């Protein structure tokens, strides 16, 4: 898709013939189609396929995943249809102004800033009317400066019909992601830097002997056998049809203990025999550095939210102005800084998911580790991190077959 997009954009350059622009592929529509297919069909199918019981055959897992995808698609279509039928359109009134005419004059002193058009008897000028259309949890402002328009005022009724477009569908997809982004991102902005700093603080500070290593490994083996026994007991309960609240609670507890056991095994291997390796020491130093940098980024994001988003009107543009100034300094400095701040938000979402819980609705949250990350975790991060709001209104058409409502502005 990316090479095709670049090739189609370059086909409209000045050194090519004009007809090339008309023969290009509709890349914008193709990107929309790929995005919708991935978020509605491909990613949910992959999540349900890998989340299904591993003891089932591939055919059974495919059927189970397809069944869940069909259910999800049905709910999605019903939600889309109901919302479009209820809030798929919006009507509002506006004032139309037109100017009178007069013979050509040589003295333009009567036309000034206070009277920028020809005023007829019985009409008065007004300015700065703001029309607002509310749709799908978003507000779209339309600013009309009427100081340069003219004087004949009449009330007319305009009906704005919002056509069903792919951007409406994309907006529906991103609502869930936006909610998860706010929830996990807020938690992750605190847990991400602090977890890195505490990992450095709790690092292995000395190399243990072989006798100590054998003793610790024996204790870990006992814990492993206890977890295995508990897991076999849960499997017997599952086969017996016991899947109540207590069963799910015990499963979650076993999963958490398994994660803790894996962390302890990794820490033991770092203390012996890898404790003296240079990479191990540098790895923890890198965690400390990134933790401090992440803490600074979290504080900056918090300040930006306070001074630019919570205060109405915004007290100061802050990060917006910083990125603009850095971009004027030279090169891609502003763009690179902006990318770092955005990427940090994505990492905060992932960290928030890891610390907030082991299960989200019907999906399990698996830890992300080097050479130990399960496929469903990647798919869940794609959905939870892709929280970019989309405009629900792509195009509009006008009609006048609905009754007018009273003019809402003085």
From Swiss-Prot:
Its main location: membrane. Residues 389-400 have a biased composition (Low complexity). PANTHER family: LIMR FAMILY PROTEIN DDB_G0283707-RELATED. It comes from the Eukaryota. Belongs to the LIMR family. Residues 389-410 are annotated as: Disordered. It is a multi-pass membrane protein. Keywords: Coiled coil, Membrane, Transmembrane, Transmembrane helix. One of its GO terms (cellular component) is membrane. It is found in: Membrane. Residues 245-274 form a coiled coil. It comes from Selaginella moellendorffii (Spikemoss). The chain crosses the membrane at residues 30-50, 67-87, 129-149, 156-176, 179-199, 288-308, 330-350. This is LIMR family protein SELMODRAFT_432208.
């Amino acid at each position: 898709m990316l090479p095709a997009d670049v090739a189609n954009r370059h086909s409209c350059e000045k050194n090519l013939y004009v007809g090339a622009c008309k023969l290009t592929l509709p890349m914008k529509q193709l990107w929309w189609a790929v995005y919708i297919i991935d978020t509605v069909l491909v990613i949910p199918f992959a999540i349900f396929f890998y989340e299904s019981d591993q003891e089932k055959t591939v055919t059974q897992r495919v059927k189970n995943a397809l069944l869940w995808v069909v259910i999800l698609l049905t709910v999605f279509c019903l939600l889309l249809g109901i919302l479009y039928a209820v809030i798929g359109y919006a009507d509002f009134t506006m004032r139309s102004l037109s100017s009178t005419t007069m013979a050509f004059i040589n003295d333009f002193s009567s036309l000034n800033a206070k009277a920028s058009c020809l005023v007829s008897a019985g009409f008065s000028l007004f300015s700065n009317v703001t029309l607002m259309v509310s749709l799908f949890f978003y507000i779209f402002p339309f600013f009309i400066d009427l100081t340069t328009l003219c004087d004949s005022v009449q009330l007319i009724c305009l009906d704005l019909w919002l056509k069903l477009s792919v951007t409406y569908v994309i907006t529906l997809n991103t609502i869930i992601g936006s909610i998860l982004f706010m929830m996990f991102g807020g938690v992750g902005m605190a847990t991400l830097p602090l977890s890195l700093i505490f990992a450095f603080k709790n690092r292995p500070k000395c190399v243990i002997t072989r006798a100590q290593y054998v003793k610790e490994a024996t204790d870990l083996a006992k814990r492993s056998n206890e977890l295995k026994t508990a897991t076999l007991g849960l499997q017997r309960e599952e086969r017996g049809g016991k899947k109540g609240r207590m069963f799910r609670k015990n499963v979650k507890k076993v999963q958490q203990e398994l994660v803790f056991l894996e962390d302890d095994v990794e820490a033991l291997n770092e203390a012996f025999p890898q404790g003296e390796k240079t990479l191990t020491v540098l790895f923890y130093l890198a965690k400390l550095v990134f933790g401090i940098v992440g803490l600074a980024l979290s504080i900056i994001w918090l300040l930006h939210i306070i001074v630019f988003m919570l205060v109405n009107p915004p007290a100061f543009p802050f990060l917006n102005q910083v990125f603009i100034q850095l971009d004027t300094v030279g090169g891609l400095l502003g763009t690179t800084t902006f990318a770092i701040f955005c990427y940090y938000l994505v990492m905060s979402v992932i960290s928030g998911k890891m610390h907030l819980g082991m299960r989200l609705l019907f999906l399990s949250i698996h830890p992300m580790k080097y050479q130990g990350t399960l496929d469903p975790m990647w798919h869940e991060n794609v959905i939870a991190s892709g929280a970019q709001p989309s405009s629900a209104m792509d195009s509009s058409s006008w009609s006048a077959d609905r009754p007018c409502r009273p003019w809402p502005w003085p």
